[in-house]
């Protein structure tokens, strides 16, 4: 058995337990599908007595009985079809929900480095397109195999029962069709995986345009984005046509073989030995109609392979993602509230896939309740230091201590509970203002505490002007708010959390001077009895810091108070002079 076949079997074995959780829905659907197939084949078999006894003998009473029987069969067919459709939709919906829940949950625990390497659009495609493909393929395959398989078997049984001599021709079909399926299976797997990759690229391209819509408009990039989208879209279309082509060729060959079998039946029927076996008009009609009816299930059972390969390719992608390691979380230490003493001890760090060191032997200590500011040019490593403190990334060498304990010994959840972070890149959720301020902890804080945090961040100034106040839904990422308003909500969120360690990464960069001065006073009150790490571009905001570290090319090149650094006349003095000469 080939390696690809083994991987498909392995993938299906992992998917089966998820489907098995909804076995009663599957059983009900399968029974209904089999019943549906039996009714269809029974309707064909009724042609024999209808032609031989009803019309052949002009028996009106028999014809009336047949009319009632046909009506009952049609009613039974409708009921079974409804049950099968409903149960399969229920199972399919449950499978999609389970897969999406597993993927979404796994995504939330993936390290930040994974998101650095994978575009958001590709991840969205995984949650939406791939999971839907698995569920739809599973439903289609089940319907086809159970209903069409049962229909094919029942039709063959009807044929053998009616005339085994004519039916013997069908035995020639099975090995030929099996051979065709084995040839195209590998091709379908490869093409299906290519389609998935193209769907991911299509989602990425669309997402980039939507997120950067203002940039596109400002720079007149419509033609560039259209060309990019057309290229990706056309690539996906071409790959889709390859699947259609392979599918069509295999279907055509199966139907050609089946047509030859039909011709053979007609030819065999001319032999006296066959005609002498009481082959009536009704019997021949049943056999011929059964063979014609077999074309549909034969075609479906042949094409089910392509759909199965698509589903398994998507499923394989999902399971490969679920097998990726989540954030390293081997620590066991938990504290209710840390004291807040932070030490960086000879920390060396480089981003994955890059040889250049983002931080090189960085060492400093922030005593409990003190404020340390990081300044330097863009890309010098300031934000990297903040990311390492919260373990968004792990150090390559050296260690980071919180209260004398390596931060890797804390559980991730407990470590991050000790830190309130306000970044220059504010993210808000499509929820109320109150829920955004008390994010992930709305039951922990009272309404009064939320209001107090908003007031301290000077956010109530604009919240009170909104019709629904704190209960206003602000849209995706706070689309209805200005940059400064969004930044104030992020500060209010950090104020409410009241963690012993406060990280301010350009926290006031989006505020006007007046608002910044007001919030600086609020932050000054907040910083009492807290350890504060400030990353600042505006040097005027960190003049009162207990210590200022000047970072350049991943190294700390200067350290001291504002006055001490100015007196040195080094890198800090140059930055200060550049800002205040503007």
From Swiss-Prot:
Residue stretches making up the ABC transmembrane type-1 domain: 27-310
Top-tier EC class: translocase
InterPro entries according to UniProt: AAA+_ATPase (IPR003593), ABC1_TM_dom (IPR011527), ABC1_TM_sf (IPR036640), ABC_transporter-like_ATP-bd (IPR003439), ABC_transporter-like_CS (IPR017871), ABC_transpr_lipidA (IPR011917), P-loop_NTPase (IPR027417), Type_1_exporter (IPR039421)
GO molecular function: ABC-type oligopeptide transporter activity; ATP binding; ATP hydrolysis activity; ATPase-coupled lipid transmembrane transporter activity
Gene3D superfamilies to which the protein is assigned, alphabetical: ABC transporter type 1, transmembrane domain, P-loop containing nucleotide triphosphate hydrolases
Residue ranges of every copy of the ABC transporter domain listed in the record: 342-578
SMART domains attached to this UniProt entry: AAA
EC annotation from Swiss-Prot or TrEMBL: 7.5.2.6
Substrates-to-products reaction catalysed: ATP + H2O + lipid A-core oligosaccharideSide 1 = ADP + phosphate + lipid A-core oligosaccharideSide 2
Subcellular location(s) per record: Cell inner membrane
Predominant place of localization: membrane
Coiled coil regions in record: none
Membrane-spanning parts: 26-46, 68-88, 140-160, 164-184, 252-272
The keyword Transferase appears for this protein: no
Binding-site residues for ATP, renumbered to this chain: 376-383
UniProt domain comment: In MsbA the ATP-binding domain (NBD) and the transmembrane domain (TMD) are fused.
Entry similarity comment: Belongs to the ABC transporter superfamily. Lipid exporter (TC 3.A.1.106) family.
Function: Involved in lipopolysaccharide (LPS) biosynthesis. Translocates lipid A-core from the inner to the outer leaflet of the inner membrane. Transmembrane domains (TMD) form a pore in the inner membrane and the ATP-binding domain (NBD) is responsible for energy generation.
The name this protein goes by in its record: ATP-dependent lipid A-core flippase
Organismal lineage: Bacteria, Pseudomonadati, Pseudomonadota, Gammaproteobacteria, Pasteurellales
Originating gene: msbA
């Amino acid at each position: 058995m080939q390696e690809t076949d083994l991987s498909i079997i392995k993938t299906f074995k992992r998917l089966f337990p998820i489907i098995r959780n909804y076995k009663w829905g599957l059983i009900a659907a399968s029974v209904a599908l089999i019943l549906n197939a039996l009714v269809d084949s029974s309707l064909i078999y009724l042609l024999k007595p209808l032609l031989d006894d009803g019309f052949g003998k002009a028996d009106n009473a028999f014809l009336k009985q047949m009319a009632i029987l046909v009506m009952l069969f049609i009613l039974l067919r409708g009921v079974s079809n409804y049950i099968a459709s409903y149960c399969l939709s229920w199972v399919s919906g449950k499978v999609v929900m389970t897969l999406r829940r597993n993927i979404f949950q796994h995504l939330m625990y993936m390290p930040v480095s994974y998101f650095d390497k994978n575009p958001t659009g590709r991840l969205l495609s995984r949650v939406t397109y791939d999971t839907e493909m698995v569920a739809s393929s599973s439903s289609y395959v089940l319907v086809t195999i159970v209903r069409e398989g049962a229909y094919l078997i029942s039709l063959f049984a009807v044929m053998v029962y009616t005339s085994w001599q004519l039916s013997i021709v069908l035995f020639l079909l099975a090995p030929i069709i099996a051979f065709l399926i084995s040839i195209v299976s590998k091709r379908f797997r490869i093409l299906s995986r290519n389609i998935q990759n193209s769907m991911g690229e299509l989602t990425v391209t669309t997402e980039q345009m939507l997120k950067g819509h203002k940039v596109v408009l400002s720079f007149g990039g419509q033609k560039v984005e259209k060309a990019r989208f057309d290229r990706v879209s056309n690539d996906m279309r071409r790959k889709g046509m390859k699947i259609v082509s392979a599918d069509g060729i295999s279907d055509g060959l199966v139907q050609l073989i089946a047509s030859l079998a039909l011709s053979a039946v007609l030819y065999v029927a001319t032999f006296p030995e066959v005609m002498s076996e009481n082959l009536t008009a009704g019997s021949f009609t049943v056999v011929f109609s059964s063979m014609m009816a077999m074309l549909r299930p034969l075609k479906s059972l042949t094409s089910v392979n392509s759909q199965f390969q698509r589903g398994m390719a998507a499923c394989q992608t999902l399971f490969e993602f679920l097998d990726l390691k989540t954030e390293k979380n081997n620590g066991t230490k938990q504290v209710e509230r840390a004291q807040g003493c932070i030490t960086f001890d000879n920390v060396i760090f480089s981003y994955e896939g890059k040889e250049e060191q983002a931080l090189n032997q960085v060492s400093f200590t922030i005593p409990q309740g003190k404020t340390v500011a990081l300044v330097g040019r863009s890309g010098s490593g300031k934000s990297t230091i903040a990311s390492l403190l919260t373990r968004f990334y792990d150090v390559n060498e050296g260690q980071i201590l919180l209260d004398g304990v390596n931060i890797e010994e804390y559980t991730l959840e407990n470590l991050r509970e000790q830190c309130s972070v306000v970044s220059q890149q504010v993210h808000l959720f499509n929820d109320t203002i109150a829920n955004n301020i008390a994010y992930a902890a709305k039951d922990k804080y009272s309404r009064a505490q939320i209001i107090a945090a908003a007031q301290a961040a000077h956010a109530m100034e604009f919240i009170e002007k909104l019709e629904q106040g704190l209960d206003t839904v602000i849209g995706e990422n706070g689309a209805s708010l200005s940059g400064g308003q969004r930044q104030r909500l992020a500060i209010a969120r950090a104020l409410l959390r009241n963690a012993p360690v406060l990280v301010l990464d350009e926290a006031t960069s989006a505020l006007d001077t007046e608002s910044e001065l007001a919030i600086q006073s609020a932050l000054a009150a907040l910083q009492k009895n807290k350890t504060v790490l400030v990353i600042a571009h505006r040097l005027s905001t960190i003049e009162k810091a207990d210590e200022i570290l000047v970072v350049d090319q991943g190294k700390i090149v200067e350290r001291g108070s504002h006055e001490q650094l100015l007196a040195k006349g080094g890198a800090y003095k140059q930055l200060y002079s550049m800002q205040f000469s503007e």
